[in-house]
Amino acid sequence: MSKYPLDLVQQYYPGAIMFEAQKYWSMSEDQKKKYNVAEVVDNGKYFGQLKKDGNWYAFVKGIGGQKYLFSRNESKKTGLLTERIENVPHIEKALDCLPNGTVLIGEIYVPGGDSNATRQVMGCLPAKAIERQKEDGYVHYYIFDCVAYDGKTFFDSGSWQR
């Protein structure tokens, strides 16, 4: 399921699970020529979701209640995904009500901003991230998927079922 060794993940992030960001599908040029795109879009087999101009993050509330916010970027030091929950204490507090063993996928974004504005907050140390948010406004977390809830994982379920 994951390219990240569980023992290494547990060493750095007790109670967490870690996985790569899902790859998103799009039609190749050959497929576009073969199929009527409007028919594919309207056939009921696919759905779209709003894309915010931010950055992908997975929120993990571990089995022991530990909270993590993993980006899709890997640390050069550990080879694991970078963790940024301390940059967004308001989001950590808002998600505290979720049961242990929950994993959400979403996008951290600056309302009215772009992905560079998001990186200005999420790419720095926590104290600077909090300072920037106090000055410029808080980032939001747009949740678009739930891949685990209360210890039950849904990785093998399709998007419609989740």
Q: Where are each of the predicted segments found?
A:
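RNA/tRNA-interacting regions in translation and RNA-turnover enzymes
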Residues: 1-69
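Covalent nucleotidyltransferase
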Residues: 38-162
